[in-house]
Amino acid sequence: MRFSRVFCSGILLVAFMGCGVTAPAQVGESIRITFLDVGQGDAVLIRSPEGQTALVDAGWSSPVTSLRALDVDELDLLVATHPHADHIGGMVDVINSIPVHFYMDNGQTHTTATYEGLASTLQQRTDITYLIAEPRSISLGSVEIEVLPLLPVASTDFNNRSIGLVVRYGDFSAFLSGDSEVEELSSWVRRGVVPDVTVLKAPHHGSYNGFTSEFLADAEPEVVAISVGSNTYGHPHTEALEAYTYAAETVLRTDLDGQITIVGYEDGRYEVVLGEEVTAMEQGRSGGLGVVGMRYIYE
């Protein structure tokens, strides 16, 4: 791709993204991670307490309507974890509809019309700065996004070169990894880069080859979110569901629960919101699990 490329350290990227001029997060502010209901695909929106946003993947078709409903009027960062259509199919419409400042992928190319359309669009957009996925830390306001090392595999093994991201806001954290399979997950375990996390996006839509017991033991998620829709692959597989149910307190699925939003607080507390978010319920939390409509509060 011939659009603007930048290969920089995390410190330099902070300056590029304007994090030095954003107001610090205040007590009680939160990160929001929303798993958009895009059917059999992935699209995850990260919003920092300061209002900066990152979209990780964009589903088969355009998620713009959902992003507009969430008041997203620009994206600081757009990430394609790997070049499969159920992850990049909606990106052209996102790029053409919403200002995007930075775009990151793993450097793999594909021969599909979907990928070639995305590449052509990006070539024409010199206003979007390109970032190659390599170990780095990206600051999205007070949220830190760690990019994990990619597995050196064959150029046609797209799933096992999915970009892995660890998202942190204080004691709250999330792990996102596209369609990573056993080989890539095991590599991260061996490298010791899988931390305890609050939220895990199930790799590869809950596939039988999208988890290992060692990976789940390291991650120790409290919530597993499975982005999945009608499919002929059997996702999520029974083995994966059993493993997630054993490992985590809560397992959620976009095909059953709709859009899933995790509201995370700096002290590690979090709330789960299913469907459209009810912003009026931000105050008045009490100990234990509270339920108001479709808002579930964990402390």
Functional labels for PLM-detected ranges:
Residues R2-R5, L13-E299:
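Non-globular, low-confidence helical/coil segments that flank catalytic cores
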